[in-house]
UniProtKB/Swiss-Prot annotation:
Location of the protein in the cell: Mitochondrion outer membrane; Peroxisome membrane; Microsome membrane; Endoplasmic reticulum membrane
Keywords: ATP-binding, Endoplasmic reticulum, Fatty acid metabolism, Ligase, Lipid metabolism, Magnesium, Membrane, Microsome, Mitochondrion, Mitochondrion outer membrane, Nucleotide-binding, Peroxisome, Phosphoprotein, Signal-anchor, Transmembrane, Transmembrane helix
Cellular component per GO, a single term: peroxisomal membrane
Disulfide bonds: none
Sites bearing Phosphoserine, chain numbering: S683
Gene: ACSL3
Cofactor(s) listed: Mg(2+)
Source species of the chain: Homo sapiens
Lineage: Eukaryota, Metazoa, Chordata, Craniata, Vertebrata
Catalysis: reaction(s): a long-chain fatty acid + ATP + CoA = a long-chain fatty acyl-CoA + AMP + diphosphate; (5Z,8Z,11Z,14Z)-eicosatetraenoate + ATP + CoA = (5Z,8Z,11Z,14Z)-eicosatetraenoyl-CoA + AMP + diphosphate; (E)-hexadec-2-enoate + ATP + CoA = (2E)-hexadecenoyl-CoA + AMP + diphosphate; 15-hydroxy-(5Z,8Z,11Z,13E)-eicosatetraenoate + ATP + CoA = 15-hydroxy-(5Z,8Z,11Z,13E)-eicosatetraenoyl-CoA + AMP + diphosphate
MF terms (GO), sorted A to Z: arachidonate-CoA ligase activity; ATP binding; long-chain fatty acid-CoA ligase activity; medium-chain fatty acid-CoA ligase activity; palmitoyl-CoA ligase activity; protein domain specific binding; protein kinase binding
Record protein name field: Fatty acid CoA ligase Acsl3
Free-text function comment from the UniProt entry: Acyl-CoA synthetases (ACSL) activates long-chain fatty acids for both synthesis of cellular lipids, and degradation via beta-oxidation. Required for the incorporation of fatty acids into phosphatidylcholine, the major phospholipid located on the surface of VLDL (very low density lipoproteins). Has mainly an anabolic role in energy metabolism. Mediates hepatic lipogenesis. Preferentially uses myristate, laurate, arachidonate and eicosapentaenoate as substrates. Both isoforms exhibit the same level of activity.
Family recorded in the similarity comment: Belongs to the ATP-dependent AMP-binding enzyme family.
């Protein structure tokens, strides 16, 4: 068993409210259309299915623990995009010289901002946005150069840390390029981090300068700057806040424009600056937090360049005609890598946010255009939660259609699903049935990149069908500079993450405790190890954790132990099947330590034993509870509920009452909202070593518990 839902998407069920004669006629037209389109397809087009079925990766030798490499890198792993461009400043200089006057970074002008009163009395900010205003490659290069020089004038030294705590926007990328040019080590922080995590990261990295926005300065930084004693300069990317004088003595607030002006003046005096080496740290990327405070991952210039080299190889015909929409956090390795790939290939990057992405987004005033409608991107990265939200919204619209429209949509959906499985295109369905759905993302998307968490087969196939494009599902970690695997554009299989990128190799290590071995049949299984130049330098000021997760082999190659369990399919594609640690990443990106949740709740008088469960396909935690018989019986009496022990444990009312007790205890134990179980299953039977659900030491056997409660897991999460 594994932690995944089915890897096979299901068809939509037809509601037979349509006239049978009309239905028969529609089926006849579909059959006729299929025959007519198949003939030219057969003679003039190579089947996508043939490409999908080809071998994509191979083991480098015949040993069970052999590393797998892409068939395009069997003779050696790729490490650079362009010859001689071995640092990020050289990559940008190359791109600037090649695409000098081409548009690079775009931002929409805010035309108007209004308060809109909702039916419940709440007030939402709504905006009307104008066209995209663009900076060319030359513009960005000059601004980055001047900003870096200005930071140097403020006392920033090469190989010292500088933090960026800012939303995704053009200024973020300009600041990053400045740091790459001047060899400043960029400490990246999520804009959603809480106060203690921000303080920890800033103090651990000993930064004196931080780049931020007015809003984050006012809402988050202002309250904690007194806890960061080394901080001297705060640079706001969008103007100085009106209350800047409130800050502690010794801290100066600058605008980005002022720092650029300072740098431009100094550059006229030809101030020299230090250039980075490939082995120098480019980024210290703080994770969003897992077991407590976030860790900083040290990523060198060569790590990032190797990673984006692998990513770029999986995007065919990438070039000047492409437009990428940037809205995910740039502090996440997926977004940073995707934007650096685009920047290095002449693509335009238009900035957005989850609140302004589409016409229906929460901050867009009704009747005005969202960012995708205005930008019409060809490339987009998304996390599964966003794709799931799109899926649910579209299906809600489908359910509101007339009976005829709904059945026509379902017929077209199922027909296209069948054709996709055979590697064929459906131009009529795309033009007449799915055009309106496709327009939700601008109408021009040719590739969706998905990462951050596993994507369900149903949602992946929905995106394929309704948005008429492949989904490049990938697997990578911050610790591997985002590199690992990405599925190829013509591979329409679901439930897997593709073959290793050309910059890295992957092997499977036996995990005896979990019962996974690289000698397993029919497919080798084990803990996923990633090797190659993209594997990062380790954790900042955390040597013990670095030694636990990284190692070098006899050839000097660096490897990362991911803690994820995978299996290689016959064509060399990787499938994630389990997780070694009890640390689980929820669909929205939060990390939950199942052991931490259990520790907070297992000492309750009402609880004899508890197992928390979560997976990356869903956004909440559930639990299995062995209740204390005396306490549960007393609780039932107080609530007026009667029945046998089994009846009480199987009672929905009793589950809800126990859940209330657990929730109160979780809040008292200071668990985060996303860590608190939302649904539970009460077990009338105790867990003993004889049942096989716990060890002789009464430690939970998670794999066996998951198998035992599989039906309850499906009930509590619901099937798609």
């Amino acid at each position: 068993m594994n932690n995944h839902v089915s890897s096979k998407p299901s068809t939509m069920k037809l509601k037979h409210t349509i006239n049978p004669i009309l239905l028969y006629f529609i089926h006849f037209l579909i059959s006729l259309y299929t025959i007519l389109t198949y003939i030219p397809f057969y003679f003039f087009s190579e089947s996508r299915q043939e490409k999908s079925n080809r071998i994509k990766a191979k083991p480098v030798n015949s040993k069970p623990d052999s590393a797998y490499r892409s068939v395009n890198s069997l003779d050696g792993l790729a490490s650079v995009l362009y010859p001689g461009c071995d640092t990020l400043d050289k990559v940008f200089t190359y791109a600037k010289n090649k695409f000098k006057n081409k548009r690079l970074l775009g931002t929409r002008e805010v035309l108007n901002e209004e308060d809109e009163v909702q039916p419940n009395g709440k007030i939402f900010k709504k905006v009307i946005l104008g066209q995209y205003n663009w900076l060319s490659y030359e513009d960005v290069f000059v601004r980055a150069f001047n900003f870096g020089n200005g930071l140097q004038m403020l006392g920033q030294k090469p190989k010292t840390n500088i933090a960026i705590f800012c939303e995704t926007r053009a200024e973020w990328m300009i600041a990053a390029q400045a740091c790459f040019m001047y060899n400043f080590q960029l400490v990246t922080l999520y804009a959603t981090l809480g106060g203690p995590a921000i303080v920890h990261a800033l103090n651990e990295t000993e930064v004196t300068n931080i780049i931020t926005s007015k809003e984050l300065l006012q809402t988050k930084l202002k309250d904690i700057v007194s806890l960061v004693p080394r901080l001297r300069h705060i640079i706001t990317v969008d103007g100085k806040p009106p209350t800047w004088s409130e800050f502690p003595k010794g801290i100066i607030v600058h605008t980005m424009a002022a720092v650029e002006a300072l740098g431009a003046k100094a550059s006229m005096e030809n101030q020299p600056h230090s250039k980075p080496l490939p082995s120098d740290i480019a980024v210290i990327m703080y994770t969003s937090g897992s077991t407590g405070l976030p860790k900083g991952v040290m990523i060198s210039h060569s790590n990032i360049i190797a990673g984006i080299t692998g990513m770029a190889e999986r995007i065919p015909e990438l070039g000047e005609e492409d437009v990428y929409i940037g809205y995910l956090p740039l502090a996440h390795v997926l977004e940073l890598s995707a934007e650096l790939v685009c920047l290095s290939h002449g693509c335009r990057i238009g900035y957005s946010s989850p609140q302004t992405l589409a016409d229906q987004s929460s901050k867009i005033k009704k009747g005005s255009k969202g960012d995708t409608s205005m930008l019409k991107p060809t490339l987009m990265a998304a996390v599964p939660e966003i794709m799931d939200r799109i899926y649910k919204n579209v299906m809600n619209k489908v359910s509101e259609m007339s009976s005829f429209q709904r059945n026509l949509f379902i017929l077209a959906y199922n027909y296209k699903m069948e054709q996709i499985s055979k590697g064929r295109n459906t131009p009529l369905c795309d033009s007449f049935v799915f055009r309106k759905v496709r327009s939700l993302l601008g109408g021009n998307i040719r590739l969706l990149l998905c990462g951050g968490a596993p994507l369900s087969a149903t949602t992946q196939r929905f995106m394929n069908i309704c948005f008429c494009c492949p989904v490049g599902q990938g697997y990578g970690l911050t610790e591997s500079a985002g590199a690992g695997t990405i599925s190829e554009v013509w591979d329409y299989n679901t439930g897997r993450v593709g073959a290793p990128l050309v910059c890295c190799e992957i092997k499977l290590k036996n995990w005896e405790e979990g019962g996974y071995f690289n000698t397993d049949k029919p497919h080798p299984r084990g803990e996923i190890l990633i090797g190659g130049q993209s594997v990062t330098m380790g954790y900042y000021k955390n040597e013990a954790k670095t030694k636990a997760d990284f190692f070098e082999d006899e050839n000097g190659q660096r490897w990362l132990c991911t803690g994820d369990i995978g299996e290689f399919e016959p064509d060399g594609c990787l499938k994630i099947i389990d997780r070694k640690k009890d640390l689980v990443k929820l669909q929205a990106g939060e990390y939950v330590s199942l052991g931490k949740v259990e520790a907070a709740l297992k000492n309750l008088p009402l609880v004899d034993n508890i197992c928390a469960y979560a997976n990356s396909y869903h956004s909440y935690v559930i639990g299995f509870v062995v209740p204390n018989q005396k306490e549960l019986t007393e609780l039932a009496r107080k609530k007026g509920l009667k029945g046998t022990w089994e009846e009480l444990c199987n009672s929905c009312e009793m589950e809800n009452e126990v859940l209330k007790v657990l929730s109160e205890a979780a809040i008292s134990a200071s668990l985060e909202k996303f860590e608190i179980p939302v649904k539970i299953r009460l077990s009338p039977e105790p867990w003993t070593p004889e049942t096989g659900l716990v060890t002789d030491a009464f430690k939970l056997k998670r794999k066996e518990l998951k198998t035992h409660y599989q039906a309850d897991i499906e009930r509590m999460y619901g099937r798609k």
